[in-house]
Amino acid sequence: MEALGDLEGPRAPGGDDPAGSAGETPGWLSREQVFVLISAASVNLGSMMCYSILGPFFPKEAEKKGASNTIIGMIFGCFALFELLASLVFGNYLVHIGAKFMFVAGMFVSGGVTILFGVLDRVPDGPVFIAMCFLVRVMDAVSFAAAMTASSSILAKAFPNNVATVLGSLETFSGLGLILGPPVGGFLYQSFGYEVPFIVLGCVVLLMVPLNMYILPNYESDPGEHSFWKLIALPKVGLIAFVINSLSSCFGFLDPTLSLFVLEKFNLPAGYVGLVFLGMALSYAISSPLFGLLSDKRPPLRKWLLVFGNLITAGCYMLLGPVPILHIKSQLWLLVLILVVSGLSAGMSIIPTFPEILSCAHENGFEEGLSTLGLVSGLFSAMWSIGAFMGPTLGGFLYEKIGFEWAAAIQGLWALISGLAMGLFYLLEYSRRKRSKSQNILSTEEERTTLLPNET
């Protein structure tokens, strides 16, 4: 792939050089970089399959066990809440714990608890089932946070000059996980029952653990002086965090609601419901590498990708139902088309956020090493988790009260507000820089005039 062919060797800025950079061929991937890509691809694929497998059939099973739509939304949402808390801790202590250990341990626990989720159908109905669902999801959330925080940091360390390209390319595997999870889960559920999808997927993730223990390189760094709170206090970082939050909530909103809406509206079997999820995930997976390459090759484009991606996402969610005031009839082909466009707009907005935060951190005095990468990774995961908690929780509640059409429109307002806020910030930033540049030119002209000899 051309994007990866141009990547430079793992030469970290600030003299914090990753191992294995010696003896590598300029302009091509070193052995360690290839291993890092394989490890990150495996965790992206496995983790997103574990996350998305519930969508087509779990809401229906949970209803049989006595859970309401609101409770189902909270079961989906609690994953993100505890991922938020764990991401902040793991991001702050990444250097102390060790990136490789955090990565491998996260995958191991994630595979184990995925298998545990498969035996929950044997738990008694009602409060006991609901409590066990929450417990297993919390354990999965902590392991997911560990693996993903470590993965992002290791990638940014190995590819310091092409962060967006690499992250965007690897989002293909995240998208592939989102693509494969629902249809594979729906098919296995329809063919073999509730337990088999979780046991199969959990075993696949566990098989990836020894591979990553062997091939993933160790990266060491000294602890940094800056904190998470200093990073989030930067205005630009705070607004980008809001963008991440809004987009994550849009993804999360669909987990407890879309399958129920499709089953009710179009009477599709569970296996076909998984295929509806395919449109958004596939377009996101395909577009992410392109937007990553654009973000690295043309950094000024990042701001416009962020803004317009949010605005397009907002429009998509208005049309997802569609919202009744538009008087457009709900049709399956229209729903799939809107999900495809929404996947494209999500990739447009999400991919530039990590390099934008990292760039802003470096501009404001954060050191260029693994410590800052851990903070940025933790912040990204934490903000994503807030949205992924609020999206399903609020989505399940609104679906129950006002129906899918209006609930989706309200969800779209979140993306609209974040897009407009980000656009306003960039306009103010441009105006401020232009005014500062004009003042500097004027000051330079005045100094030059005073230095010229007076004419007699």
UniProtKB/Swiss-Prot annotation:
InterPro entries: MFS, MFS_dom, MFS_trans_sf, MFS_Vesicular_Transporter. GO terms for biological process: serotonin uptake; spermidine transport; spermine transport. The modification Phosphoserine is found at S21, S438. The chain crosses the membrane at residues 34-54, 71-91, 101-121, 128-148, 162-184, 196-216, 231-251, 273-293, 305-325, 332-352, 378-398, 408-428. Gene3D superfamilies: MFS general substrate transporter like domains. The modification N-acetylmethionine is found at M1. Keywords: Acetylation, Cytoplasmic vesicle, Membrane, Phosphoprotein, Synapse, Transmembrane, Transmembrane helix, Transport. Residues 1-24 are annotated as: Disordered. It is a multi-pass membrane protein. It is found in: Cytoplasmic vesicle, Secretory vesicle membrane; Cytoplasmic vesicle, Secretory vesicle, Synaptic vesicle membrane. Residues 10-23 have a biased composition (Low complexity). Expressed in various tissues including lung, placenta, adrenal gland, liver, testis, and brain. Residues 55-70, 122-127, 185-195, 252-272, 326-331, 399-407 are extracellular. One of its GO terms (molecular function) is transmembrane transporter activity. It holds the Pfam family MFS_1. Residues 1-33, 92-100, 149-161, 217-230, 294-304, 353-377, 429-456 are cytoplasmic. Belongs to the major facilitator superfamily. Proton-coupled polyamine antiporter involved in the translocation of polyamines from cytosol into secretory vesicles prior to their release via exocytosis. Uses the electrochemical proton gradient generated by a V-type proton-pumping ATPase to couple the efflux of protons with the uptake of a polyamine molecule. Facilitates vesicular storage of spermine and spermidine in astrocytes with an impact on glutamatergic neuronal transmission and memory formation. This is MFS-type transporter SLC18B1. The lineage of its organism: Eukaryota, Metazoa, Chordata, Craniata, Vertebrata.
